[in-house]
A protein has these predicted regions:
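Conserved PLP-enzyme active-site core in the AAT-like
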Residues: 13-20, 37-61, 65-70, 74, ...
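Structural signature of PLP-dependent enzymes
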Residues: 305-329
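N-terminal export signals
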Residues: 2-5, 9-33
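Flexible, glycine/charged-enriched surface loops at secondary-structure junctions
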Residues: 93-98, 113-116, 288-291, 311-320, ...
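A general structural detector for well-ordered alpha-helical segments in enzyme core domains, enriched
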Residues: 209-213, 327, 368
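Conserved C-terminal alpha-helix-loop-beta "cap" of PLP-dependent enzymes
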Residues: 51, 331-412
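Generic N-terminal amphipathic, Lys/Arg-enriched alpha-helix
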Residues: 59-69, 80-87, 352
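Metallocofactor- and cofactor-centric catalytic cores in central/energy metabolism, strongly enriched
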Residues: 69, 74, 80-81, 88-91, ...
Length: 418
């Protein structure tokens, strides 16, 4: 395949030579040379240590979880350090993506023939993955998207799996064929079917579960995608679905793994992962050009994954529960207030707590939520998802923030007794 956007072959191959030589002197790629060892000290903007405050933007205590609207998660210091090293050098992005994908596949012990791609997030992984299935490595088709003339054009999805993120599927130009039953799925399969899409968080809502969905896809020889963006923990999900036979799986890098917010992983068959890259930045005239992932995010994602795989996940879960217990003990001292605990089966599979109260407290959950947001420091806590009271989790809280929430929430509830 001849790629017009790779037409300057001499420069590209020269860049690979630089990359190879730099691996013999790793400080050139990842380390510090004597002249750049010192950390830059901000002057002007950022000199206060709180650039958000300088802009008049309020930082918040996040009791809602890894919400993109709140910035996802906080990048680990070790990840920041690797990203800072990455920022000091130029590198061939396609070569870096290939090397990073191999490293990720090794770390996750993916099945033979599987690879990985660092994307700008799980949503990008969804769109790029489908785009690659539609076009393969055909340059004309890649540049043609979202015009699907001459390509397969339909994606089968369960009705209960429809969600705002299937916009990424529709963005390729594909038509969603919505089904509910096994018989409807079999009837929907045609020569136009490009992919079968599964939203992992909706596993319990649909009639066809995660394991049967991929078996049906294999039966019809249709590529099968699983959107598992928020589905770590448990950590095993990072390889479970590939081992189950899914051709492509998407994960967010900026949630529980605490990698760069603008990073994600597309895991799957090596050919499809390669086609996804061809439909993405750094290549021009592609659907995914605007979903650029930088060298800093690529290397930061590898470091975040390394740290995540080596964590004591049981100890972390206990720490999260301890934080909720502290808050529960404080708020239940207020007459009429009670708490209960739950852990979602999939998606944000971490300890959660629901906080409820009876008529002895005169506020609605919405009023309490707004008061917490308006407090100092500002606290963001979610609603009860259509259920009474407030719901929260603690896995994005920083040390000491559980006590702040306990104090603020107890005060608000106590001050508004009937």
């Amino acid at each position: 395949m001849r790629l017009r956007w790779n037409s300057n072959r001499r420069k590209f191959l020269g860049g690979l030579g630089v990359l190879a030589s730099s691996m013999a002197m790793p400080w050139k790629l990842f380390g510090s040379s004597p002249e750049n060892k010192s950390e830059a000290t901000p002057s002007g903007f950022g000199a206060s240590g709180n650039p958000y405050e300088e802009l008049g933007v309020t930082t918040v205590i996040n009791a809602e979880g890894t919400m993109t609207m709140l910035g996802g998660s906080l990048i680990r210091p070790e990840v920041e350090a690797v990203m800072a090293l990455a920022a000091r050098h130029f590198v061939s992005i396609p070569a870096l993506e290939e090397a990073a994908g191999k490293r990720v596949a090794q770390m996750l012990k993916l099945p033979e023939g599987y690879g990985a791609l660092v994307t700008s997030g799980a949503a990008c992984a969804i769109q790029s993955g489908l785009a690659g299935i539609l076009t393969g490595d055909n340059e004309t088709l890649i540049q043609q998207l979202p015009d699907l003339t001459g390509m397969k054009s339909e994606v089968i999805i369960q009705k209960s799996h429809r969600n705002p993120f299937d916009h990424q599927l529709r963005g390729t130009g594909a038509k969603l064929v919505v089904i509910e039953t096994r018989d409807q799925l079999r009837a929907a399969v045609s020569e136009r079917t490009a992919m079968m899409h599964f939203s992992n968080f909706a596993n319990e809502a649909g009639q066809i579960k995660v394991d049967e969905w991929v078996k049906l896809a294999k039966e019809y020889k249709i590529p099968c995608f699983n959107d598992a963006a928020a589905d770590t923990p448990p950590v095993s999900h990072l390889w479970d679905y590939a081992n189950m036979g899914y051709d492509l799986v998407a994960f967010s890098g900026g949630k529980a793994m605490r990698g760069p917010q603008c990073a994600g992983l597309l895991i799957g068959r090596q050919d499809l992962v390669h086609y996804a890259l061809l439909n993405n930045s750094p290549y021009e005239d592609t659907l995914g050009r605007g979903q650029k992932v930088g060298k800093e995010e690529i290397l930061g994602m590898i470091k975040a994954l390394e740290l995540y795989l080596n964590e004591d996940h049981d100890a972390l879960a206990q720490e999260w529960q301890n934080r909720l217990d502290l808050i529960s003990r404080a708020v239940t001292r207020v007459p009429g207030v009670s708490t209960s605990f739950f852990t979602p089966d999939i998606a944000n599979h971490v300890p959660h707590m629901r906080i409820m109260w009876d008529s002895r407290v005169t506020l609605t959950p919405q009023q309490v939520s707004q008061m917490l947001r308006n407090s100092t420091p500002s606290i963001v806590m979610g609603g009860g998802e259509g259920k009474p009271g407030l719901a929260m989790n603690s896995f994005m809280l920083q040390p000491g923030e559980d006590q702040i929430i306990a104090d603020q929430l107890s005060r608000i509830l106590r001050e508004h007794k009937a």
